[in-house]
């Protein structure tokens, strides 16, 4: 990528789109400091706390209870503006009813484990959330809850997804990866970009 500069603003919700192999995941890894750029740099502020939901997911101790998995991370999640939500309430918000919270992880379906993984990312109270293909394995109801959460999220968010409908609901502009190190900053959502 040549001559590309970008400064993320607080509360910004950005979508990243592009064909496979155009560098989206590499860009995310460089932003998070997992991969060094060949040239140039990423300056990340001292107060930035990344929350990263990846396609690879997270391995859980299958013998733990759902509530314990999340409670081992934090007793509450910081929602911004001085608002906090306890573990049980937060799990309930993400569709784990109180009785389900005391189930063992091994009893969860694949979709429920993905939802639990999402909760573990969010419980770390990130102020810069990166959702890399998060919509692939989440059901419609969970996506609706995530959509609401992102609308109220008091930090930056990057969403990498092929789900146009979800992107239209949660992002205010796009970075379009067009291949050959070409990135376009587009001020609008996915549908607006396609019509442009």
What spans do the regions from the language model cover?
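ABC ATP-binding cassette signature C-motif
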Residues: 1-196
């Amino acid at each position: 990528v040549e001559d590309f500069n970008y400064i993320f603003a607080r509360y910004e919700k950005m979508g990243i789109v592009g064909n496979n192999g155009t560098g989206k995941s590499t860009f995310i890894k460089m932003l998070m400091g997992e991969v060094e750029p060949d040239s140039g740099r990423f300056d990340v502020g001292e107060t930035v706390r990344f929350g990263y939901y990846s396609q690879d997911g997270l391995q859980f101790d299958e013998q733990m209870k759902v509530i314990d998995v999340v409670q081992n991370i934090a007793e509450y999640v910081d929602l911004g503006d001085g608002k906090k939500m306890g573990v049980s309430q937060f799990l309930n918000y993400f569709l784990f009813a109180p009785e389900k919270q005391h189930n063992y992880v091994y009893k969860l379906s694949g979709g429920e484990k993905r939802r639990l993984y999402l909760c573990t990312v969010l419980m770390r109270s990130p102020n810069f959330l990166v959702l890399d293909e998060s919509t692939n394995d989440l059901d419609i109801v969970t996506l609706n809850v995530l959509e609401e959460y992102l609308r109220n999220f008091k930090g930056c968010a990057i969403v990498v997804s092929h789900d146009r409908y979800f992107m239209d609901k949660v992002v205010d502009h796009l970075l379009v990866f067009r291949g050959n190190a070409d990135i376009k900053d587009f001020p609008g959502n996915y549908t607006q970009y396609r019509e442009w």
